Design a protein with these regions (language model features):
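Transmembrane helix boundary and interhelical loop/hinge segments in multi-pass membrane proteins
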Residues: 28, 77-97
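Hydrophobic alpha-helical transmembrane segments of multi-pass membrane transport/permease proteins
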Residues: 31-54, 69-73, 178-189, 214-221
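Long, hydrophobic alpha-helical segments
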Residues: 64-80
Length: 235
């Protein structure tokens, strides 16, 4: 029996939300090394940045928000490569397609869990900007809020780029090239919101805009990703 035939034969009859969630949560916990690498990269960047630019408080405060956000973006892009490639290689995607499971639901669950283990933790670690960049706790709180509201949209854009390059031999190299131009506006708006609050102005409209964009991307992008994943499996 061929590998593809055995994969089809092993396909489950029905897959609901909770079985998918439990399975993806267990897979994420078992691959701790993979999701720890981006977090280590984030910590390395925000730790070494103050050493590189000097200890002048005003300079650190001016560059701190941008440095944390760039580190968050790089760590997010770094962890996207393993989102769908293993599922395609080990037959999980084939099982889901053959079982007529909801691919958009699976994609959404996978991305939500990935966000919890990546940007969710990064948002908490961003509070290290208080001692490292001489930010106030208020500014650090706004920075964390901007990461929470903006990072889901960044993740969805990276996931779309990853799914588009899934069938390519060196597709991981193309993911940042495709995703970063779309992610730069999010980065600009997020850092701008923190700067507005720091100067005493109201940055809530920008945070609301980031949140609206993230909600819209969460509602739409899983369907787009599901279509591209199915095309990659058929090819």
């Amino acid at each position: 029996m061929s590998e593809k035939t055995s994969t089809i034969a092993a396909a489950p009859r029905s897959i609901g939300f909770m079985p998918l969630w439990r399975r993806e949560w267990q897979v994420k916990q078992q691959g701790a090394v993979q999701w720890l690498y981006p977090l280590v990269l984030f910590l390395v960047i925000i730790t070494l940045f103050p050493l590189a630019v000097g200890s002048e408080p005003e300079l650190l405060q001016r560059l701190g928000v941008s440095a944390v956000w760039i580190a968050a973006l790089l760590s997010l892009v770094m962890g996207v490569d393993g989102l769908f490639k293993p599922a395609l290689d080990n037959g999980t995607l084939a099982q889901l397609v053959v079982a007529k499971a909801s691919l958009p639901l699976w994609v959404l669950i996978r991305l939500v869990i990935h966000w919890i283990f990546s940007s969710g933790i990064v948002a908490i670690l961003s509070l290290l900007a208080v001692p490292l960049f001489q930010l106030s706790w208020f500014e650090a709180g706004i920075l964390m809020a901007s990461i929470v509201t903006g990072s889901p949209m960044l993740l969805m854009l990276s996931a779309v780029a990853s799914s588009l390059t899934l069938s390519l031999k060196n597709g991981a190299v193309l993911v940042p090239l495709i995703a970063l131009p779309m992610q730069l506006p999010v980065l600009i708006f997020a850092t701008g919101a923190v700067d507005l609050f720091a100067t005493g102005l109201n940055g809530l409209p920008i945070l609301a805009l980031l949140l609206a964009g993230s909600i819209l991307s969460v509602l739409v992008m899983p369907w787009v990703i599901a279509v591209t994943l199915k095309m990659s499996w058929l090819n």
